[in-house]
């Protein structure tokens, strides 16, 4: 009998960084996550798996808590656009072990007048390599007769992405050509500047030849507190408010944890597979380890995620779209400090995706 190998394709973004953002709220690229395994067991003599995953989102919805404060004239605010291609290669090892290297490349931009003193409509941009992640994974059940399995993985995220990307900002009312070089919005930075540690759990259960269930959990632990990059951009906040930011540590970007949970079902129709899933993801206000200083866009997103996959002999083509159900920003530690100082409830706003979809191709060799 040929050795039975559980195949797991894990398109991980990051998007830019391993914990990237849906606008200002972190999101992981889990669309298509675990699809080979979720479609059942696969017999293979191949030793490698490759996944090329592409993500695009556009965001202009601005929430403070659950209150929508998106400007009627979108050009007066900030819109976010991100394109990320993730290259992930997995080496299959004996006894259901595997190792994975995840390399993201991103092109991110903000558009609008808000970052340019409400005077000029401009684009700020960041392009390049994101934060690379390496992980070791193990399937826990080895019996061929099992209708399901659970995989656990531990990894490390390296600060390879530029977390100090800069572009030009225009805020001189007397000279439209005058520009200030400064760090771009944290939502479009390519990395977070911290070495992180990841834990993940993936599982599936085969109900029948046509239906199987799956679940995924991912958590990025970021021990570093702040990365030293200024959190504000020229022209985006009043000078008086910046003094409050300094007092509460919100003037410098944080290096936050982030998490994703996802579960759903696959329905197989010969080579075509329809997937329906729910996903919950976000950035906590308090990290598991370390301090919680600095500017972070804390909050969570609950979404529905339908998708289609097409199976070939040794490969898989997939496309997913996320549909937001509930979105909320929450108070950060600097927000709580500002509330205490001013006596007024303070909360950091966050952008949320209005368009978000994933397209990818996975294969073994």
Region annotations inferred by a language model:
Residues 111-252:
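Outer-membrane pore/translocation modules
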Residues 38-41, 52-54, 87-91, 101, ...:
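Residues on the lipid-exposed face of transmembrane beta-strands in outer-membrane beta-barrel proteins
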Residues 1-24:
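Bacterial Sec-dependent N-terminal signal peptides
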Residues 19-64, 69-71, 141-151, 159-164, ...:
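Outer-membrane beta-barrel biogenesis signature
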Residues 48, 61, 97-99, 143-145, ...:
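Repeated loop/turn-to-beta-strand initiation elements of outer-membrane beta-barrel proteins
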Residues 77-82, 124-130, 189-196, 253-257, ...:
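Short sequence motifs at beta-strands and strand-loop junctions characteristic
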Residues 63-72, 220, 225-365:
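Outer membrane beta-barrel transmembrane domains
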Residues 4, 77-139:
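Long, hydrophobic/aromatic-enriched structural stretches that serve as scaffold segments
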């Amino acid at each position: 009998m040929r050795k039975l190998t559980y195949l797991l394709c894990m398109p991980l973004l990051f998007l830019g960084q391993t914990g990237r953002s849906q606008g200002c709220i972190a999101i992981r690229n889990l669309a298509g996550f675990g699809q080979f395994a979720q479609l059942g067991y696969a017999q293979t003599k191949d030793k490698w798996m490759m996944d090329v995953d592409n993500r695009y989102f556009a965001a202009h919805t601005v929430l403070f808590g659950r209150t929508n404060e998106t400007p009627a004239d979108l050009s007066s605010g900030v819109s976010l656009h991100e394109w990320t291609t993730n290259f992930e290669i997995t080496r299959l090892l004996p006894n259901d072990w595997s190792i994975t290297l995840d390399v993201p490349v991103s092109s991110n931009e903000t558009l609008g007048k808000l970052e340019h003193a409400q005077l000029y409509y401009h684009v700020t941009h960041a392009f390049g390599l994101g934060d690379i992640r390496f992980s070791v994974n193990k399937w826990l059940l080895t019996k061929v007769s099992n209708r399901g399995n659970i995989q656990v993985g531990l990894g490390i995220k390296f600060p390879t992405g530029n977390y100090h990307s800069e572009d030009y900002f225009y805020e001189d009312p007397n000279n439209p050509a005058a520009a200030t070089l400064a760090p771009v919005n944290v939502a479009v930075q390519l990395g977070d500047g911290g070495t992180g540690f990841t834990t993940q759990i993936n599982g599936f259960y085969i109900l029948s030849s046509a239906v199987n269930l799956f679940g995924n959990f991912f958590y990025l632990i970021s021990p570093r507190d702040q990365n030293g990059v200024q959190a504000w951009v020229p022209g985006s906040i009043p000078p008086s408010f910046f003094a409050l930011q300094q007092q509460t540590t919100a003037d410098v970007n944080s290096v936050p944890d982030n998490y994703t949970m996802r579960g759903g079902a696959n329905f197989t129709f010969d080579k075509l597979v329809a997937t329906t899933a729910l996903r919950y993801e976000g950035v906590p206000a308090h990290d598991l380890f370390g301090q919680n200083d600095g500017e972070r866009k804390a909050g969570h997103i609950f979404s529905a995620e339908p998708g289609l996959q097409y199976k070939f002999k040794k490969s898989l083509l997939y496309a997913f779209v996320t549909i937001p159900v509930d979105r909320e920003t929450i108070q950060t530690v600097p927000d709580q400090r500002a509330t205490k100082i001013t006596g007024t409830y303070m909360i950091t706003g966050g952008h949320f995706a209005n368009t978000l979809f994933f397209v990818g191709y996975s294969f073994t060799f």
